[in-house]
Amino acid sequence: MAEVGLEGNQPVDLSKHPSGIVPTLQNIVSTVNLDCKLDLKAIALQARNAEYNPKRFAAVIMRIREPKTTALIFASGKMVCTGAKSEQSSKLAARKYARIIQKLGFDAKFKDFKIQNIVGSCDVKFPIRLEGLAYSHGAFSSYEPELFPGLIYRMKQPKIVLLIFVSGKIVLTGAKVRDETYTAFENIYPVLTEFRKNQQ
């Protein structure tokens, strides 16, 4: 059964996903500029979903339930939002955090919203010979099983880092748009099938 992304149970568009597998988006990291100076102590005291420990980290950590995300809010007005599962959810969450800051009396705007990183994952459902892959794709691969069980594959085009595990599970990170995630997976899929482990 091919994995299907956010489309629910619609069939996979094979013109876009020839492998029949659509990587699932797991985490979106976005940034926005609230474009005003913030008093982090005041925010932490007034907002019930916020924590601030300046000795540990120079930002307020705020969480909301819907979309389930975490924001890092800096005194400069810069904000990082993590944890959303889609670009739209990430933007919606960032807007919600901006509104919370506005309600606390700050003149927060919503400038330069940008998706910085998309993390996706999928499962090719067959085991992979990582040693062989690392050997034949040495220029792009680093594989040191004593340090980390996955092979790290740095694709040049699109510029995506893939973590490839012997089990056939794949993590893709570094995309700014979801199509880069999809393209990177379609690029690597024939390589993975080439290094498929024959099960005895």
Swiss-Prot record:
Entry's Gene Ontology cellular component terms: nucleus
GO terms (BP aspect): DNA-templated transcription initiation
Compartment annotation: Nucleus
InterPro entries membership: TBP, TBP_CS, TBP_dom_sf, TBP_eukaryotic
HAMAP family: TATA_bind_prot_arch (MF_00408)
Complex formation: Belongs to the TFIID complex together with the TBP-associated factors (TAFs). Binds DNA as monomer.
Protein name: TATA-box-binding protein
Organism in which the protein naturally occurs: Nicotiana tabacum
Lineage: Eukaryota, Viridiplantae, Streptophyta, Embryophyta, Tracheophyta
